[in-house]
């Protein structure tokens, strides 16, 4: 079974990759913005610099049975300026929808989306 994990450099992604790569029934592939995850072989990594509604996932999803989507923008920072909320939405909403649509079109049989409250942004009340 071919499994694609997005967000492999995060806490859950690292643990999930380690676990699944030890299982003999799985061929595990990952996406990453940057490479630093120890133990990954280059043929297991697809570099995706931007997750948005314009990301083309079709070649990456070829032959994939399961997508486990963990990648997200977890922080909206003041220094990002006026467009930070738009960038946040572009990755976490539009980018996730684009991946799900392409997974459906590619015949992926399972799409597992793991998220947290952090994708809604963190804001201090009465700041």
Language model feature labels by segment:
Residues 3-23:
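N-terminal Rossmann NAD(P)H-binding glycine-rich loop of SDR-like oxidoreductase domains
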Residues 25-34:
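Conserved glycine-rich Rossmann-like NAD(P)H-binding loop of the short-chain dehydrogenase/reductase
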Residues 36-37, 44-91, 102, 119-122:
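NAD(P)H-binding glycine-rich loop region in Rossmannoid oxidoreductase-like domains
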Residues 94-127:
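Conserved Rossmann-fold NAD(P)-dependent oxidoreductase catalytic core, especially the SDR/UDP-sugar
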């Amino acid at each position: 079974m071919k499994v694609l994990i997005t967000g492999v450099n995060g806490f859950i992604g690292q643990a999930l990759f380690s676990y699944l790569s030890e299982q003999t029934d799985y061929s595990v592939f990952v996406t990453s913005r940057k490479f630093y995850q120890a133990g990954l072989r280059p043929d297991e990594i697809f570099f995706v610099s931007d997750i948005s509604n314009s990301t083309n996932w079709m070649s990456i999803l070829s032959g994939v049975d399961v997508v486990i989507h963990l990648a997200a923008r977890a922080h909206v920072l003041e220094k990002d300026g006026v467009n930070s909320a738009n960038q946040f939405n572009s990755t976490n909403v539009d980018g996730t929808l684009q991946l799900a649509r392409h997974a459906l079109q590619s015949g992926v049989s399972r799409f597992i989306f793991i998220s947290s409250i952090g994708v809604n942004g963190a804001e201090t009340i009465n700041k």
